[in-house]
């Protein structure tokens, strides 16, 4: 989800119809996943359900779920076009208030009184933000006993029965990703470095100071012996720095579950995923023969069929002191 000026151009001028396509191409957050968040809030937090913030709302899909549990939801995004599209998509409820705001600036935006929110949700956006500033801002928004929920899913992982086929598909996925990134100049600059560091660290670089937070739990699905990065880091300057800010009192729950958010993907679904996640990079419809060759090779490896795809996912939960 767009949360800073550096990412506005990715989603500029994309309407509600585009966001429907985007949601179809990506994994769906399951009801069991949301239950983990809500149970944490009920058992370790205040169990108050008056106000929630959805930071980096994108198409408003998370805000819509929060509106089923909270009396009021404030959904924000740095992109005005994204906010307008989300408003159109979520017209079925009057419980969501949308506003344009950079995530790190929310505490100063006056959208809600300081330290009154019961939950702050931040889905798939923390790598685009200054994590230290963002977590500090969320602390200012939350009331004592309020819950911070930050999550991110990484690159898809092919999970069929044949390991050799899975590995071949993964290599082609990286080659497609590398080709697309090279077309826009590669992965470089301080914002890219910050983003890739957060993803490569599996969000372990997101710190929760004990003066502000308690009952920190880091859930990780399908993260062992894998990378969350969407590109092959060896193609862009070598290994990305991993940062670990996990505190000694924090709980880490690691799970391996190939069925977690599982989807079925063939070559067409891989193409749709890239085109949905990198929309403005496909505005030039001139055929890229190398790129088309990789899609054809992927379809050949798959035998024209599809494979199950799973996801490495990290969910951070913390309770405001």
From Swiss-Prot:
InterPro entries: Diverse_substrate_MTase (IPR051052), Methyltransf_25 (IPR041698), SAM-dependent_MTases_sf (IPR029063). SUPFAM superfamilies: S-adenosyl-L-methionine-dependent methyltransferases. One of its GO terms (molecular function) is methyltransferase activity. Pathway: Secondary metabolite biosynthesis; flavonoid biosynthesis. Keywords: Flavonoid biosynthesis, Methyltransferase, S-adenosyl-L-methionine, Transferase. Signal peptide: none annotated. Gene3D superfamilies: Vaccinia Virus protein VP39 (3.40.50.150). Methyltransferase; part of the gene cluster that mediates the biosynthesis of chlorflavonin, a fungal flavonoid with acetolactate synthase inhibitory activity. Within the pathway, cfoB is responsible for the methylation at position C7-OH of flavonoid. The pathway begins with the PKS-NRPS hybrid synthetase cfoA that uses benzoic acid or p-hydroxybenzoic acid as a starter unit with four rounds of chain elongation using malonyl-CoA to form the chalcone skeleton. GO terms for biological process: flavonoid biosynthetic process; methylation. Belongs to the methyltransferase superfamily. Its EC number is 2.1.1.-. Disruption phenotype: Impairs methylation of the flavonoid skeleton at position C7-OH. It comes from the Eukaryota. It comes from Aspergillus candidus. Disulfide bonds: none annotated. The keyword Heme does not apply. It is an enzyme of class 2 (transferase). This is Methyltransferase cfoB. Pfam families: Methyltransf_25 (PF13649).
């Amino acid at each position: 989800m767009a949360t800073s000026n550096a990412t506005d151009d990715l989603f500029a001028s994309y309407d509600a119809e585009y966001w429907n396509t985007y949601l179809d191409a990506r994994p769906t957050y399951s009801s069991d996943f949301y239950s983990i968040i809500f149970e944490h809030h009920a058992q370790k937090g205040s169990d108050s359900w008056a106000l929630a913030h959805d930071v980096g709302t994108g198409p408003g899909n998370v805000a819509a779920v929060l509106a089923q549990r909270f009396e009021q939801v404030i959904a924000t995004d740095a992109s005005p076009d994204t906010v307008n599209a989300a408003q159109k998509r979520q017209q079925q409820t009057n419980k969501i208030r949308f506003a344009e705001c950079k995530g790190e600036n929310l505490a100063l935006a006056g959208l809600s009184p300081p330290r009154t929110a019961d939950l702050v949700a931040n889905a798939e956006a923390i790598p685009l933000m200054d994590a230290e500033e963002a977590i500090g801002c969320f602390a200012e928004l939350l009331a004592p006993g309020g819950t911070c929920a930050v999550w991110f899913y990484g690159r898809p992982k092919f999970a069929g029965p044949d390991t050799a086929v899975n590995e071949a598909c993964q290599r082609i996925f990286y080659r497609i990703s590398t080709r697309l990134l090279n077309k826009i100049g590669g992965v470089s600059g301080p914002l890219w470095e910050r983003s890739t560091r957060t993803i490569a660290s599996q969000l372990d670089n997101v710190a929760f100071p004990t003066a502000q937070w308690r009952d920190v739990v880091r859930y990780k699905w399908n993260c062992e012996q894998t990378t969350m990065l969407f590109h092959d880091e060896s193609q862009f300057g070598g290994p990305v720095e991993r940062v670990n800010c996990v505190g000694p009192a924090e709980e880490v729950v690691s799970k391996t579950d190939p069925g977690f958010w599982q989807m079925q993907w063939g070559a067409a679904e891989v193409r749709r995923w890239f085109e949905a996640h990198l929309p403005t990079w496909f505005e030039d419809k001139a055929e890229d023969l190398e790129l088309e060759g990789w899609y054809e090779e992927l379809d050949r490896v798959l035998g024209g069929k599809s494979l199950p795809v799973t996801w490495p996912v990290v969910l951070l939960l913390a309770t405001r002191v």
